[in-house]
From Swiss-Prot:
Entry EC number(s): 7.1.1.-
Annotated positions binding [4Fe-4S] cluster 1: 64, 67, 70, 114
One of the GO biological process terms: photosynthesis, light reaction
One annotated GO molecular function: iron ion binding
Residues given in the record as [4Fe-4S] cluster 2 binding sites: 74, 104, 107, 110
4Fe-4S ferredoxin-type domain sequence ranges: 55-84, 95-124
Pfam families reported in the protein's UniProt record: Fer4_10 (PF13237)
Organism of provenance: Zea mays
Function: NDH shuttles electrons from NAD(P)H:plastoquinone, via FMN and iron-sulfur (Fe-S) centers, to quinones in the photosynthetic chain and possibly in a chloroplast respiratory chain. The immediate electron acceptor for the enzyme in this species is believed to be plastoquinone. Couples the redox reaction to proton translocation, and thus conserves the redox energy in a proton gradient.
Keyword line: 4Fe-4S, Chloroplast, Iron, Iron-sulfur, Membrane, Metal-binding, NAD, NADP, Plastid, Plastoquinone, Quinone, Repeat, Thylakoid, Translocase
Protein family (similarity comment): Belongs to the complex I 23 kDa subunit family.
Protein's name in the database: NAD(P)H-quinone oxidoreductase subunit I, chloroplastic
Top-rank lineage group of the source organism: Eukaryota
Gene Ontology cellular-component terms listed: chloroplast thylakoid membrane
């Protein structure tokens, strides 16, 4: 009779322990019900990129002196710079500049080391195409500025963290105090 009684006691202890684990898990689940959803509806809601986000490269043709520093610092020798030497002005004349974003790793070395600041990173990250050859941007495509996410009224922008919403409210309140 004692083995049967000890079996019932151990079964009861295991049942209580299992109920306690289920209760703890349920409390953790309930604590997450007040959180905002992490998933966003991508085409209609977009995250605002950080200030130092490295997106598509913007190129200003008039500033470029064809020094090819961008090619030398690029880990994959990606930018293609075509130039010719003008004897009358004794300077290089830029003919063509192109970057293949299908190969680019967006490291930002070309932007950082450019002596004339003709290269800059934009917040544009939507570079998907059906043909990989369309990712080869020449100087005309590189000089186009991206459409700002903030200016598009059809897209709802989502901040990445709740702290940024608090900071935004603080900055809004401080602006209303200082602006008369």
């Amino acid at each position: 009779m004692f083995p049967m009684l000890t079996g019932f006691i151990s079964y009861g202890q295991q049942t209580i322990r299992a109920a306690r684990y289920i209760g703890q898990s349920f409390i953790i689940t309930l604590s997450h019900t007040n959180r905002l959803p992490i998933t966003i509806h991508y085409p209609y809601e977009k995250s605002i990129t950080s200030e130092r986000f490295r997106g598509r490269i913007h190129f200003e043709f008039d500033k470029c002196i064809a020094c090819e520093v961008c090619v030398r610092v690029c880990p994959i020798d990606l930018p293609l710079v075509d130039w010719r030497f003008e004897k009358d002005i004794k300077r290089k004349q830029l003919l063509n500049y192109s970057i293949d974003f299908g190969v680019c790793i967006f490291c930002g070395n070309c932007v950082e080391y450019c002596p004339t600041n003709c290269l800059s990173m934009t917040e544009e990250y939507e570079l998907s195409t059906y043909d990989r050859h369309e990712l080869n941007y020449n100087q005309i495509a590189l000089s186009r500025l991206p459409i700002s996410i903030m200016g598009d009224y059809t897209i709802q922008t989502i901040r990445n963290s709740p702290q940024s919403k608090i900071d935004e409210e603080k900055s809004w309140n401080s602006r209303t105090i200082t602006d008369y």
